[in-house]
Amino acid sequence: MTEPKIDRRQLLKLEAAAIAAAAAGMPTVARAANLVTEREATELKWDKAACRFCGTGCSVMVATKDNRVVATHGDIKAEVNRGLNCVKGYFLSKIMYGHDRLTHPMLRKTGGQYDKNGEFTPVSWDEAFDVMALKFKDALKKRGPSGVGMFGSGQWTIWEGYAASKLFKAGFRTNNIDPNARHCMASAVAGMMRTFGIDEPAGCYDDIEATDAFVLWGSNMAEMHPILWTRVTDRRLSAPHVKVAVLSTFEHRSFDLADVGMVFKPQTDLYILNAIANHIISTGRVNKDFVSAHTVFKKGQTDIGYGLRPEHPLQKKATGAAKANDATDISFDEYAKFVSDYTLEKAADMSGVPLNRLQALAELYADPKTKVVSFWTMGFNQHTRGVWCNNLVYNIHLLTGKIAEAGNSPFSLTGQPSACGTAREVGTFSHRLPADMVVTNKEHRTKAEHIWQLPEGTIPDKPGYHAVLQSRMLKDGLLNAYWVQVNNNLQAGPNANEETYPGFRNPDNFIVVSDAYPSVTALAADLILPTAMWVEKEGAYGNAERRTQFWHQLVSAPGEARSDLWQLMEFSKRFKIEDVWPEELIAKKPDVRGKTLFDVLYKNGQVDKFPLDQIEPGYANDESKAFGFYVHKGLFEEYASFGRGHGHDLAPFEAYHKERGLRWPVVDGKETRWRFREGSDPYVKAGTGVQFYGFPDGKARIFALPYEPPAESPDKDYPFWLSTGRVVEHWHSGTMTRRVPELYKAFPEAVCFMHPDDAQEANLRRGDEVKVASRRGFIRARVETRGRDKPPRGLVFVPWFDESKLINKVTLDATDPISLQTDYKKCAVRIERV
């Protein structure tokens, strides 16, 4: 190395460093020494990628050096985050480098042989897949297609979810595949489909800068979507007329910005929503022209139960459970009469929210001069009537015509980076196919079979086991070979003690978990497969505003870790068609005889038609190199053919590597910001102004839906409500964020947030250890009475990121009967001193 020379500019830098270091109490020699280094030693390669965390869809710039991610920063060219990152985003460079990163397949063994009660032992990929294939074939032989299943993720890349759905629905001929988005977004999907006949929001993030009012329903955006919250905050503080209303069952950081803050009793949001609709009607503020031209009215089925096991008393007495999604036609007058019982005065009594605040909230919606954006997340969706909540907030926007235009938008925010792009759009749910198609519709199945080049009748016509039902079927021994990818359901799933863990350890079952780290779920499995993360593979995510984003592989995965996509496709080689399809199906397409599932599904002349030389020069692509063709482009273009031409259009593959994402539908190279509005959405017919084209009549549905009580409420034995959720420092189960030292130290363990008066009454002090116990289980946690979250009396809040405090041992596995999404926000507990 040549002797470093210091010029005048560098000398000034050194002097400045010395002054700054002295002020901070830092040793100046070490600080200054880092400023003079050869250029070659500091050169970094920068590239764009979508953030690995929430559904906001921030773009980040990623720096790599020596095959390692060494830095990240917010992408200043990105429309979504405009150069900003949240606290988690700032530490993205560290998520892949935890000390316990998995690098080899691990199989439970005793004496060199697989043993469900054995110790995890490193094995080769060949041995791992050989044992796994044997167990899947045994399950198929024993129970047919219903004996195998998969639990996937809203963190799958688009092509991973597509390949997985294809493998199970077409290859194994089972719809027993579901994403963990069932726990977070299923009610939003069902709400959109019921109201509009098509999924995903009408608006986009640009609404933030155009609106006059924000209403947050069960959404702590300040912590869960902090980058969007910065945009909301900027709009509120820079435009004095703008108002912010926040509704929640406890006070949180989003209340700091609220002009109208409302803490309501759990489940009474249903009552408040109907009361607002009644206020709009009774004060004469219905947009009659809009309602007449663009809506019809429906009365929904009532008494629909709580998605519990059929033998549960609540299910037995639910008269409408078997037809939960049904609805009948009614008139506007009948709807108006229905909601007339829901007055703001009654809503105040029911909810505990002061009447003047409910009136202020209702006026934001009713005033025709006020543009309104409604945001919601898990407070609505993780709800035994979550679909109804979605429908009811759409009612309000439709009654006033405040929809599908800049600043007027009902908007469900997503929690995972590709809950929209992969779970919803690809259709990895147990009842869905790509582009809003469903397995119960013969025309949809026929189209999928045509695109996938399958014989008629390949795809089953009944929905498979959804997330909660998968756990029940595993426990009952009816689902015997099970593959989990990119989620931690033993920590995340409800009622884990009684319904989830027993199925994992059922001796009749073989459980495979693909993960980058030894999560709670991985450690309960029989086989662990080490997985490539984030920029260790080429990827694509779709965010909450319909924005699809791509990134290149930037570094290699450690050891023998492989991507979920590689695992899915490589595993498919272990099955001949004769292993999985009946003879009568094979006879319809004799040319598949003797071929593997890999040949039929992925080497089918479509997925494999793009050669390796189409990969952009300068980037690695481990999966494509392994299979001999550009896998990602082939899968994407085949998948995109489902949606092009009917409102789900995606741009050509290459466009996404050039852009910071595009919002679909993308027609003739132009993205769509506001759907259903003439002049913005290319699918709206000229002269209609607004067209909700998800339904043949072009009209949205306004639903009459009542208040119904929760599945479980506090009583003398369990006197507190329990609500669970997240904190800004950690993401979901903490598998990644708890391995980042700075984030771990910032919030090292979950606590039980409690009202000070409740604590005092129980003779508890801040920091005391307590049991949080329900009828299903308990955890131990320390009491927090002065934290950021401030529950009202009678409610406690416990985050679920901490694997040492598995709060989902306590929660109830009740679901919305329509969406089958779990309610993590309402169950009854008691608090006991340890």
Curated annotation (Swiss-Prot):
Q: Tell me the PANTHER family matching this sequence.
A: PERIPLASMIC NITRATE REDUCTASE, RESPIRATORY NITRATE REDUCTASE
* Subunit and interaction comment: Component of the periplasmic nitrate reductase NapAB complex composed of NapA and NapB.
- List, alphabetically, the InterPro entries matched: Asp_de-COase-like_dom_sf, CT_Nitrate-R-NapA-like, MoPterin_dinucl-bd_dom, Mopterin_OxRdtase, Mopterin_OxRdtase_4Fe-4S_dom, MopterinOxRdtase_cofactor_BS, Periplasm_NO3_reductase_lsu, Prok_molybdopt-oxidoreductase
The cofactor required is: [4Fe-4S] cluster; Mo-bis(molybdopterin guanine dinucleotide)
Write the record's keywords in alphabetical order, separated by commas.
Answer: 4Fe-4S, Electron transport, Iron, Iron-sulfur, Metal-binding, Molybdenum, Nitrate assimilation, Oxidoreductase, Periplasm, Signal, Transport
Mainly resides where? periplasm
- Where is each 4Fe-4S Mo/W bis-MGD-type domain found? 44-100
What name appears for this protein in its UniProt entry?
Periplasmic nitrate reductase
Q: Which classification does the entry list for the species?
A: Bacteria, Pseudomonadati, Pseudomonadota, Alphaproteobacteria, Hyphomicrobiales
> EC number(s) for this protein?
1.9.6.1
Gene Ontology cellular component list: membrane; nitrate reductase complex; periplasmic space
**Species this protein is from:** Bradyrhizobium sp. (strain ORS 278)
Q: Does the keyword Iron-sulfur apply?
A: yes
Enumerate the catalysed reactions: 2 Fe(II)-[cytochrome] + nitrate + 2 H(+) = 2 Fe(III)-[cytochrome] + nitrite + H2O
Report the leader peptide range.
1-32
Gene3D superfamilies found in the cross-reference section: 2.40.40.20, 3.30.200.210, 3.40.50.740, Dimethylsulfoxide Reductase, domain 2 (3.40.228.10)
The Gene Ontology terms for molecular function here are: 4 iron, 4 sulfur cluster binding; electron transfer activity; iron ion binding; molybdenum ion binding; molybdopterin cofactor binding; nitrate reductase (cytochrome) activity
What does the cofactor field's note say? Binds 1 [4Fe-4S] cluster. Binds 1 molybdenum-bis(molybdopterin guanine dinucleotide) (Mo-bis-MGD) cofactor per subunit.
Where does the UniProt annotation locate this protein? Periplasm
Q: How is it modified after translation?
A: Predicted to be exported by the Tat system. The position of the signal peptide cleavage has not been experimentally proven.
Q: Which residues bind substrate?
A: 800
At which positions is [4Fe-4S] cluster bound?
51, 54, 58, 86
